[in-house]
UniProtKB/Swiss-Prot annotation:
It comes from the Bacteria. The keyword Transport applies. Pfam families: SDF (PF00375). It comes from Citrobacter koseri (strain ATCC BAA-895 / CDC 4225-83 / SGSC4696). This is C4-dicarboxylate transport protein.
Length: 428
């Protein structure tokens, strides 16, 4: 049945974002005070992410007939992530070299306020590849759930799912309990999502109120260049991948439009992770595939963040007249292939990884980060939106690759067809 426009989450979030922009622009002090509304919504979502991932992965793996299928899915997913994220890095590098948004700024690094980025540089020290891999192993199971570390929870869930599968019929009771618990958690998520318009309003009002539209003008060329690059990446690269997998990228974007609007308001793709797990399963992807690909993609398949990292690093070089030849840019690319895997789908993580990369490369002035500190928040929306679409496409592609995709269901859902073959509006 067709949902009333005013009752649809899509309309409510879009309206809330518009009101937030107006409030932040005309009453900046009041707008800046709306920050707790956005923070509270994101915290509520984070509260249920760990149990959702655990339940989805455990029931998905334990319910599979063969454990080899799980290993094959994981290997295919990691291969896909590496290829596509590398393409994203290269595209960002090419575009920023062609457009050269930082050229002519002639900024002296000595005049920049290094203190403004000191906290990010300090956090970046822990972003080494060894530290990242060690951090995947939790100090305790309770600690993994308490901290909400996605990869730690995922590791424990995979091990738990394998162990439960080996129990066979003896583990059926535990399996049923976890599946029932999963339904309760998704019920909580439905309640939280009713607050999405309030969260989007608060986050957007704060952003405009604190940083102002004027901030966009000074470094607008980089922002415009980045947004256009992200759009081209989604339409051309992800669009081509989607076409090869047998579906339209535009129909897929329409299918996840509510999630995209929530991400637009909160600047965090993590805010819709629970909903994406549910929607990708409804799209025809097997639960075990969704449970592995989506959470893992939040650290290993951040296409938008990859584009941002190469563009921002070269922009700083251009603005500060720090010469970067082919050797330096290839070195930057290699470092980013590793450091970009440590970025999570939360606001601010991309900037921390950028600080880590610039420190590792050594050729660029760390103080140059101050140039984009003020506008980083405005670019986080494009990063998060691209990351979300990228992970959704990855799930369908991996499911198709390992033959765990219901093609008829995918076609019916994306074309708004009911099981009876009739075409009408389906609730999303």
């Amino acid at each position: 049945m067709k949902t009333s426009l005013f009752k649809s989450l899509y309309f409510q979030v879009l309206t809330a974002i518009a009101i937030g922009i107006l409030l932040g622009h005309y009453y900046p002090e009041l707008g800046a005070q709306m920050k707790p509304l956005g923070d509270a919504f994101v915290k509520l979502i984070k509260m249920v992410i760990a149990p959702v991932i655990f339940c989805t992965v455990v029931t998905g793996i334990a319910g599979m007939e063969s454990m080899k299928a799980v290993g094959r899915t994981g290997a295919v997913a990691l291969l896909y992530f590496e290829i596509v994220s590398t393409i994203a890095l290269i595209i960002g590098l090419i575009i920023v070299n062609v457009v050269q948004p930082g050229s002519g700024m002639n900024v002296d690094p000595a005049t920049l306020d290094a203190k403004a980025v000191a906290i990010y540089a300090e956090q970046a020290k822990d972003q080494g590849i060894v530290g990242f891999l060690m951090d995947i192993i939790p100090g305790s199971v309770i600690g993994a759930f308490a901290s909400g570390n996605i990869l730690q929870v995922l590791l424990f869930a995979v091990m738990f799912g394998f162990a439960l599968h080996r129990l066979g019929s003896k583990g059926q009771l535990i399996f049923n309990v976890i599946e029932s618990f999963s339904q309760v958690i998704f019920g909580i998520i439905n309640m939280i999502m009713r607050l999405a318009p309030i969260g989007a309003f608060g986050a957007m009002a704060f952003t405009i109120g604190k940083y102002g539209v004027g901030t966009l003008v000074q470094l607008g060329q980089l922002i415009v260049c980045f947004y256009i690059t992200c759009i081209l990446f989604v339409v051309v690269v992800l669009g081509s991948i989607a076409r090869a997998a047998g579906f339209s990228i535009f129909k897929f974007i329409r299918y996840i439009r509510e999630e995209l609007l929530i991400v637009l308001g909160t600047s965090s793709s993590e805010s819709v992770l629970p909903r994406m797990l549910d929607k990708m399963e409804k799209l025809g992807c097997r639960k075990s595939v969704v449970g592995l690909v989506i959470p893992t993609g939040y650290s290993f398949n951040l296409d938008g963040t990859s584009i941002y990292l190469t563009m921002a690093a070269v922009f700083i070089a251009q603005a500060t007249n720090s010469h970067m030849d082919i050797f330096h840019q290839v070195t930057l690319l290699v470092v980013l292939l590793l450091s970009s895997k440590g970025a999570a789908g939360v606001t601010g993580s991309g900037f921390i990884v950028l600080a880590a990369t610039i420190s590792a490369v050594g050729h660029l002035p760390v103080a140059g980060l101050a140039l984009i500190l003020g506008i980083d928040r405005f670019m986080s929306e494009a990063r998060a939106l691209t990351n979300l679409v990228g992970n959704g496409v990855a799930t369908v592609v991996v499911a198709k690759w390992v033959k765990e995709l219901d093609h008829k269901k995918l076609d019916d859902v994306l074309n708004n067809r009911a099981p009876d073959g009739k075409t009408h509006e389906l609730s999303s």
